[in-house]
Amino acid sequence: ADYLRLARA
């Protein structure tokens, strides 16, 4: 999972 992108959501 792309946690780096999810945190930017």
From Swiss-Prot:
It is found in: Secreted. Keywords: Neuropeptide, Secreted. One of its GO terms (cellular component) is extracellular region. One of its GO terms (biological process) is neuropeptide signaling pathway. It comes from the Eukaryota. Belongs to the FARP (FMRF amide related peptide) family. FMRFamides and FMRFamide-like peptides are neuropeptides. This is Extended FMRFamide-2. It comes from Tyrannophasma gladiator.
